Amino acid sequence: MAGGAAHPGAELLPFARFLDSSLQPLVYGYGRGTLHELRAREFGRLAGTVYLDHAGTTLFPQSQITSFMKDLMENVYGNPHSQNISSKLTHDTVEQVRFRILAHFHTSPEDYTVIFTSGSTAALKLVAEAFPWVSPGPEGSGSCFCYLTDSHTSVVGMRKITAAMNVSSIPVRPEDMWSAERQDAAAAGDPAGQPPHLFCYPAQSNFSGTRYPLSWIGEVKSGRRRPASRPGKWFVLLDAAAFVGTSPLDLSVHQADFVPISFYKIFGFPTGLGALLVNNRLAALLRKTYFGGGTAAAYLAGDDFYVPRESVAERFEDGTISFLDVIALKHGFDALERLTGGMESIRQHTFTLAQYTYTALSSLRYPNGAPVVQIYSDSDFSSPEVQGPVISFNVLDDHGNVVGYSQVDKMASLHNIHVRTGCFCNTGACQRHLGISDEMVKKHLQAGHVCGDDVDLIDGQPTGSVRISFGYMSTLEDAQAFLRFIIATRLHSSHGQPLPLATPGEAGAPPEDSEAQNAVPAARARGSSSPQEDTSPHSGVWNNSPTAVDAEGLCPPLLEATGTQQTTSEKAADVPDGDLRSHVITNLFLYPIKSCAAFEVIRWPLGSQGLLYDRSWMVVNHNGICLSQKQEPRLCLIQPFIDLQRRIMVIKAQGMEPIEVPLEENSEQVQICQSKVCADRVNTYDCGEKISNWLSKFFGRPYHLIKQSSDFQRNAKKKHGKDQSAHTTATLSLVNEAQYLLINRSSILELQQQLSTSCENGKEELFPMNNLISRFRANIITNGTRAFEEEKWDEISIGSLRFQVLGPCHRCQMICIDQQTGQRNQDVFQKLSERRERKVKFGVYLMHTSLDLSSPCYLSVGSQVLPLLKENMEHHDIPATE
């Protein structure tokens, strides 16, 4: 990241100056009260949040849900396939919603039919199955399916259905469609008797926001513009899912044959409901094989006799539609009209925000003149006719190298800015804009990169980008908070400090947590630095911690430290320095409850999954979803202590009475349930109502404590390194990836020095050594001599125990959480990112090899660590443990 004095390229573009310089009139807001009032009244849950993923889904207003719930509470809606009074009400209401949808798109039941589906993807699949394809024969070439390469995966996936019908698929590049010569209607020839073809293209690219001409619909259908040189009649499917969320669509003018949509893109609620708008002139040609409930006029169970219903909608809506969700659409339309005045107002408002952000973002420069971002677009954001409220980009460093989108996403999360990263289910546009060849896509797959993961750079080349998008409730403050975030993390002021971000309570600032701010962390067993490395006046910050536990002596873990007891710092001081090249264990930590506070020990037994009872429990919400400090930072204030003699875990927290949980389940009483950790299914059991009530009281919401079942074996998902054989696959507790995490004090010391240089002279040190160690939540701490030397290790030996190094840990934003208070500070992540050249790696994962548990095995503070280096070892990045 660049430093140095402020310069014009680091300034935030004033909105007033932008409006004055615009060549066209721009509209911001809706002219009926302030947008801030609308946000406060309808979207109060967005306080402190910058939501910029409206292309993924927009957000619903509070009044929409309130109105819908009132409707449900006042009316009885029965199954529309029945004939009773409540069912008749449902049927009539659903039909009114169909009319409302058609009116929204400026058409009528005479021209179009609304077929409800589960979403636009299901609508596309329906078209692929029902279109009247003609297979090639001896007398003709048959139908063809053409699609713009800048299309969603769900469009491209239609080719698998057409291929089964022996129908050819032809991808068409946007530039080829743009340059296709227009013909007059006479030159196009008579399509009578020729096979039908289908051309699919998006009204708006979900990757870049490019808006393709709606005039293509009429030109292709009339034969004046051909996607491919095939004789026959052309039909057009307009993928409007991304477009209609922020723009009006007039089907009386642009009469596409098929228009798939998803309603959550427009209203935010309901999800799981979409529609296919079918031009009635084509409806009679559609074919259907399967028939479900409600679609038959008559059929025989014992003979192949079936007559479909006459209504196109009833013929294709198999089974009972999601009628309550359909009824919810009425309240969505009402809210949208009431709050904004209509889609044209939304189009103007969202485009103004996008054009401003694009202008400001593209003007940012490093002191050497290099751009801060690379924007992927086919337009100059000159008009909403050619560009939607979407900006796809990658952040660059001052040498022009791409900063991985995963890192940008993590940094944005620290500021509570919600963006989308990757290729957005649009590989064609991703390849085109990023210059990724077909061969590179296959190579990336072989390297382990799949759609939707966080592998953002391969050989320095980006595999995707960052996307921001605006919705009707987006504000100027959202746009400016995002721009300030880019400026603050990429450009610096004259003092070397980041430019100011939003203040608490303002858009873009993390929400204030008064409970966390006022919480005083109780004494807990944690690590401390060795004397030669931490000589600051704050080195005794944890001197009130209880003594670290010796598993052999089984010191009672709940005893507070006294003058006669040896403190953690004193025990660390007993570790011999030895040769400069030697490494010893200075601290051992286990984390009995995933994402909760550490429990420090002096000597501890090993189990088949790592340190005994390390991450054997986890806290889940009322839906059984595992919680981490990313969602609930105050988890770090929950302090577990393991008492091996009494076979219990004692849990403490500030303001709460200690509570005990048995280490093992009662097999006769326990009820096994299933949960997930990093997409892995795990068998667990609930630890009971008593601890659940305790947790719920502390956090103020219903939580449960669950433990991994002792007879359930969970294997690591993949092998790491070249030489690891299948029989060495590790068994895991509730960790994400590996059994152990090791960090090196020299690496911590370098990070500490970097953070110290950011402080003004004489300012109190913000990051003592112990504070930093606790943030990385490692099991094994060593006193290495060189920063990050552990990443070069292949194996280590600790006494008779051997451990394989699986690779570096790729860190997430959890390292920004102070483990004593639960408060966030993004400096740690940012500085580590600078030091590690865009990849936030810290610590290495270990797996024990050939562990014989027939006799007890222990790790101890003071044990010598002997690393083994191997040249040309490959290690893949592994996500952080929690």
Curated annotation (Swiss-Prot):
Signal peptide bounds: none
Keywords (A to Z) from UniProt: Molybdenum cofactor biosynthesis, Phosphoprotein, Pyridoxal phosphate, Transferase
Composition bias type Polar residues, residue spans: 527-546
A Gene Ontology biological process term: molybdopterin cofactor metabolic process
GO molecular function ontology, one term from the record: lyase activity
Effect of residue 193 to P: Requires 2 nucleotide substitutions
Record's catalysed reaction(s): Mo-molybdopterin + L-cysteine + AH2 = thio-Mo-molybdopterin + L-alanine + A + H2O
Pfam families: Aminotran_5, MOSC, MOSC_N
Domain MOSC: 707-868
InterPro entries: Aminotrans_V_dom, MoCF_Sase_C, MoCo_sulfurase, MOCOS_middle, PyrdxlP-dep_Trfase, PyrdxlP-dep_Trfase_major, Pyrv_Knase-like_insert_dom_sf
Gene3D superfamilies in UniProt: Type I PLP-dependent aspartate aminotransferase-like (Major domain)
Disease annotated for this entry: Defects in MOCOS are the cause of xanthinuria type II (XU-II). XU-II is characterized by excretion of very large amounts of xanthine in the urine and a tendency to form xanthine stones. Uric acid is strikingly diminished in serum and urine. In addition, cows suffering of XU-II cannot metabolize allopurinol into oxypurinol due to the lack of ADO activity.
Name this polypeptide is given: Molybdenum cofactor sulfurase
